[in-house]
Curated annotation (Swiss-Prot):
CDD domains: Pyruvate_Kinase (cd00288). Keywords: Acetylation, Allosteric enzyme, ATP-binding, Glycolysis, Kinase, Magnesium, Metal-binding, Nucleotide-binding, Potassium, Pyruvate, Transferase. The modification N6-acetyllysine is found at residues 76, 319. This is Pyruvate kinase I. It is an enzyme of class 2 (transferase). Mg(2+) binds at residues 222, 246. The gene is pykF. Catalyzes the formation of pyruvate in the last step of glycolysis, it is irreversible under physiological conditions. The reaction is critical for the control of metabolic flux in the second part of glycolysis.
């Protein structure tokens, strides 16, 4: 069974009910909506379509809204045509938005461009395809020397590696998009270009103000500043997305894999969910099979311990969206089979909190008894994530009375959430857990299961792990 979860970006190729049903069958767990593209009517329809499919099939999936975030882009060019730049030529950026650009100058969307940059800084355009060095700053103009040949287009992303920029965490568009997300009841917000703790807090306050206090925030780490402040960002967030696209432009490409491993490890220790994203099966936008390197990349992220792997263009606009999900699911399943439980966390000598100690004990017991299933009663999802931290061989069946929690646990590795009407007592939990263990096919008559619950089942400290034979 596949334990690693798959996040699929949904676009024109995959938005119909028919396609969404096939994507769920193929292994999709979370629908990602990229708010850098599309309007509210399109995104609203996609959400409705997924909910219709879920109610018809009884399958559970989560919805993730990915914000555009505070980014810098190039503006208009003459005739809307790309311009060719040559290595060695001079090129100027201006903050005067009325300028229509050409092969010598273009306007950028960010007012503070001239104040944040210094002579000697690097400017990268279009995912780093064109590099420039700042040679002078005059008034509202930044004058650069072009470092390599390339074609510059309008509305292309501009990165300033190593420069701390004063853009707000939430652009006006993001604020409106988050309100839309609250109205639609999305499960997660993936917040782009998070640079520091206060960015996350600002987003959380905005969500709270519009009835979205239960939406989980996944912070996307996309630049050096985000990496430098990673610990404080992790603490303020519900999870992390390792956004390797922009990150690989902002930091040297050979550093990205080490940043990925560091972030995944810290997320596991903190019991926070982590998604590894960008270019995972990139060649499948055009080809029916991935490269061997891509298949290895997906497996490597899973071995690192990621909760989920993500498809972007592969599922939103590619030629082979279904094949991409199927192949990714196959790689997940194969790699999940070789993962061992991790009861020995290095340097984990600190005293464990009650919940964590009980959950760790449950995993240890399940390993020793070869139990195929650990059943957890969880209100907000903490206990289920505490069990997941130790990578049990057993599947985790998480019973919750909270619909939001059920959807959010869809993203956690190895967790199968199950919404139940009520759990009145510990005995009721044992009865219900055993019934659902058999019904779901996750365990069979005669199997040993480990059950984890609290004294006050509705909420409170998880303090009991017990062993049952079905």
């Amino acid at each position: 069974m596949k334990k690693t979860k798959i996040v699929c970006t949904i676009g024109p190729k995959t938005e119909s009910e028919e396609m969404l049903a096939k994507m769920l069958d193929a292994g999709m767990n979370v629908m990602r909506l990229n708010f850098s593209h599309g309007d509210y009517a399109e995104h609203g329809q996609r959400i409705q379509n997924l909910r219709n499919v879920m109610s018809k099939t009884g399958k559970t999936a989560a919805i993730l809204l990915d914000t555009k975030g505070p980014e810098i882009r190039t503006m208009k060019l003459e005739g809307g045509n790309d311009v060719s730049l040559k290595a060695g030529q001079t090129f100027t950026f201006t903050t005067d938005k009325s300028v229509i650009g050409n092969s010598e100058m273009v306007a950028v969307t960010y007012e503070g461009f001239t104040t944040d940059l210094s002579v000697g800084n690097t400017v990268l355009v279009d995912d780093g395809l064109i590099g420039m060095e700042v040679t002078a700053i005059e008034g509202n103009k930044v004058i650069c020397k072009v470092l390599n040949n390339g074609d510059l287009g309008e509305n292309k992303g501009v990165n300033l590696p190593g420069v701390s920029i004063a853009l707000p965490a939430l652009a006006e568009k993001d604020k409106q998009d988050l309100i839309f997300g609250c109205e639609q009841g999305v499960d997660f917000v993936a917040a782009s270009f998070i640079r520091k703790r206060s960015d996350v807090i600002e987003i959380r306050e905005h969500l709270k103000a519009h009835g979205g206090e239960n939406i989980h925030i996944i912070s996307k780490i996309e630049n050096q500043e985000g990496l430098n402040n990673f610990d404080e960002i992790l603490e303020a967030s519900d999870g992390i997305m390792v956004a390797r696209g922009d990150l690989g432009v902002e930091i040297p490409v050979e550093e990205v894999i080490f940043a990925q491993k560091m972030m995944i490890e810290k997320c596991i220790r903190a019991r926070k969910v982590v998604i590894t994203a960008t270019q995972m099966l990139d060649s499948m936008i055009k080809n029916p099979r991935p490269t061997r390197a891509e298949a290895g990349d997906v497996a490597n992220a899973i071995l690192d311990g990621t909760d989920a792997v993500m498809l972007s263009g592969e599922s939103a606009k590619g030629k082979y969206p279904l094949e991409a999900v199927s192949i990714m699911a196959t790689i997940c399943e194969r790699t999940d089979r070789v993962m061992n439980s991790r009861l020995e966390f290095n340097n984990d000598n600190r005293k464990l909190r009650i919940t964590e100690a009980v959950c760790r004990g449950a995993v240890e017991t399940a390993e020793k008894l070869d139990a195929p299933l650990i059943v957890v009663a969880t209100q907000g999802g903490k206990s289920a994530r505490a069990v997941r931290k130790y990578f049990p061989d057993a599947t985790i069946l998480a019973l919750t009375t909270n619909e939001k929690t059920a959807h959010q646990l869809v993203l956690s590795k190895g967790v199968v959430p199950q919404l139940v009407k009520e759990i009145t007592s510990t005995d009721d939990f044992y009865r219900l857990g055993k019934e659902l263990a058999l019904q779901s096919g996750l365990a069979h008559k005669g199997d040993v299961v480990v059950m984890v619950s609290g004294a006050l089942v509705p909420s409170g400290t998880t303090n009991t792990a017990s062993v049952h034979v079905l």
